[in-house]
Amino acid sequence: MIDFKKKLNREVSKKHVNPIDLYSELDRSSTTGPLRPTQEKVLREWNDIHRGKRDLVVKLHTGEGKTLIGLLMLQSKLNEGEGPCVYICPNKFLADQVYYEAKKFGIKVSLITENNTFPNDFIDGNAILLTYVQKIFNGKTIFGLDNQYQKVNTIVMDDAHACLDAIKQAYT
């Protein structure tokens, strides 16, 4: 006979909400090192001061790790139960780069399927949806309009200037 009480009473491991703690627990490849001081500073300030705020801008120089910062913020939101979350890139090429970056760091991302549907991991708040501007801002958006839409809790827009230019082009 199986005693299911032992199985059901197991303590569920708590997911980290603090993005710095979260990073230390990721199943990342051995080629990745610790967070850079700038990344830690931005993540700490976001977590301690700006976490509940909307419409934030993170501005850093090229190569300072904005992609990882954005992914950690979104993963933190998912761990908090605040999904679904979307990471938007200005084009497909950069989305592919971010996909491999996320995999390298052990952050679960999902992609819109070939038949333009949302993956269940995204809908259930278990993975970050990684996409690019043209998939979202077009005349046939799969995110929906009116009463038929996909709820999204948090969005990170990588390289916002380039994304905004692509959005303008889509509607002119």
Regions found by a protein language model. Give the residues of each.
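N-terminal helicase ATP-binding lobe
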Residues: 1-172
